């Protein structure tokens, strides 16, 4: 699914894109106790979307990586939609640091 096709309250979303920005992890209190979360901006050829990475997911992907996301759900926060990956969902790095690869191809 392309990013511009993603709408609020969708479930079981599968998409892919390049991580173009990533925040430093921060601690938040959840109903499961304190957890770490980082926000990333995911981009494809149709647009961008915010994505929350929790705990172990944070170290899986970095700026420049192209990732595949499966089983995500969509929420709306401050009038912007964002992807969330539940425990049953996955994020997989398809190409590690595509920026370096682009440079090598030149």
Language-model segments: which ranges?
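Short, glycine/small-residue-enriched coil/turn segments at secondary-structure junctions
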Residues: 3-16
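Short structured motifs
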Residues: 1-4, 53-55
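Short beta-strand-initiation
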Residues: 1, 35-37
